[in-house]
């Protein structure tokens, strides 16, 4: 079994995005904090990056990151289910260090805590919808 994580360059983003988009649509629909249009706009900025994880040459996950000051945020991560997408973490963390980031940040549902045992919860976010 061969896992590979690919950083998508600006030059290949146009060709890669249609393949990645369904994974990210699924992720943003579950989360609700971002729309796919916002993610697409973010990817036009130099602070954002698109990542693809493959296993045996089959795409299993894709992620969007954003460097914001001294942190690298995983904005959206969509995958085939299960822990397969975890192969993304080490390359994303290495990239964050190369961008002078002191930390990685993931904001999401409580299930992320279980999926990311090396990460800690520095605070709790509470919200109330004002419909």
Predicted regions and their residues:
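Conserved donor-binding loop and adjoining core beta-sheet/short helix segment
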Residues: 45-83
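Acyl-donor binding region in acyl/amide transferases
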Residues: 70-117
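Short amphipathic alpha-helix that is part of the acyltransferase structural core
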Residues: 1-34
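Terminal substrate-recognition subdomain of acyl/acetyltransferases
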Residues: 1-3, 11, 107-131
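Active-site rim helix/loop that mediates acceptor-substrate recognition in acyltransferases
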Residues: 28-48
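Charged/polar, solvent-exposed surface patches and flexible loops
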Residues: 15-22, 26, 41-44, 87-90, ...
